[in-house]
A protein has these predicted regions:
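Extracellular/luminal regions of secreted and cell-surface proteins that mediate adhesion/ECM remodeling
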Residues: 1-254
Length: 254
C-alpha cells in the first residue's frame, strides 16, 4: 500500500516509575508551541516509521517530570485507558498496542561520587506479588558499589562490581497489596575515582510472577534464567517472570 499513512502523536510527562499506570502521566500532556496536545505524523508506506514536523515544548521549569509516554493513533482521538487493576492488564496493553512507547530515563551531570535515586513502585492488586529486581551497572569503574532497597517489599541487595558491566538481581517474596512507594537505587564510586565516567549507566528492571492462566505469561522467562537458585526457588516452576517496567540513569559530564 503506497498511500501515505497519517495519524497523530500525543506525548505525556511522567515521574520515574517502575509501573507506568495512566494516573502517573494522564494529566501531564505536552503541547506544541501553538498549544495543540498532539502533532500530526505521516509515513509514505504502511509499516514505515512515522515522522512529525511540529515539536513538543519541554519546559524544564514547569515540571520535574522528565520521563515520557507516547501514544500514536490513526486519528486525533485521545485514547488513554483507566488505571490498570492488575500487572497482567498493563503488560497486555503494552504488547497489544505498538503505538505506545515509554522512555523512563534520567540524564544527569554530577560532581558527587555517590548517587541515589528513588524509583516509583506500585502494586495495583489486592494481593501480594512475588517479584524480581535487576540492577545493571554499565561502563562503571571496577570497585563501584551498587545497591537497591525497598523495606516494605523486603528488598535489600548490594554488590561491589568486578567488571565494567555488572547485574545485581534479587527476588522478593511479596510486594505488598496496593503498595505505593519507592525503590531506592544507589551507587558509590571507589576512592580512586574522582567522578563518574561519561555514559556510565544504571538500569533498574522490575519483573513480576505470572501464572499460566494470565495472558502475559507468554512473554515471560523462567526465573532460573535470571536468578540464583535460592531466589528462583521462591517462584512456582510453572510461573514466569514478566517485565513490567524499567528506570535508567545515564551520567554525563557536567
Amino acid at each position: 500500500d503506497s498511500t501515505p499513512q497519517e495519524g497523530s502523536l500525543r506525548l505525556y510527562r511522567a515521574g520515574v516509575s517502575l509501573f507506568m499506570t495512566p494516573s502517573v502521566w494522564r494529566g501531564n500532556a505536552m503541547k506544541t508551541p501553538a498549544g495543540d496536545p498532539y502533532v500530526k505524523v505521516s509515513a509514505i508506506n504502511k509499516g514505515d516509521v512515522a515522522v512529525g514536523v511540529t515539536p513538543f515544548v519541554l519546559d524544564a521549569t514547569a515540571s520535574n517530570r522528565f520521563c515520557l509516554v507516547g501514544i500514536a493513533n490513526t486519528d486525533r482521538t485521545e485514547t488513554v485507558p483507566e488505571d490498570f487493576r492488575t500487572y497482567d492488564e498493563f503488560v497486555v496493553w503494552i504488547h497489544q498496542n505498538p503505538g505506545v512507547c515509554v522512555r523512563n530515563l534520567n540524564v544527569i551531570g554530577t560532581t558527587k561520587t555517590n548517587y541515589e535515586q528513588l524509583d516509583g513502585l506500585k502494586n495495583p492488586e489486592d494481593k501480594p506479588r512475588h517479584a524480581a529486581f535487576y540492577l545493571t551497572a554499565t561502563n562503571v569503574p571496577v570497585g563501584t558499589t551498587i545497591g537497591m532497597q525497598c523495606e516494605p517489599a523486603k528488598l535489600e541487595a548490594s554488590v561491589v562490581t568486578s567488571s565494567e558491566t555488572e547485574t545485581l538481581s534479587a527476588a522478593v517474596p511479596a510486594v505488598p497489596p496496593h503498595f505505593d512507594g519507592f525503590v531506592r537505587v544507589w551507587a558509590v564510586l571507589p576512592p580512586s575515582e574522582p567522578s563518574w565516567p561519561d555514559d556510565a549507566r544504571l538500569d533498574l528492571d522490575y519483573g513480576v510472577e505470572m501464572a499460566p492462566s494470565m495472558q502475559s505469561h507468554q512473554w515471560g522467562i523462567h526465573p532460573r534464567e535470571v536468578l540464583c537458585a535460592a531466589d528462583a526457588s521462591l517462584f512456582n516452576s510453572a510461573f514466569r517472570l514478566v517485565m513490567v517496567g524499567s528506570c535508567g540513569t545515564i551520567f554525563k559530564s557536567a
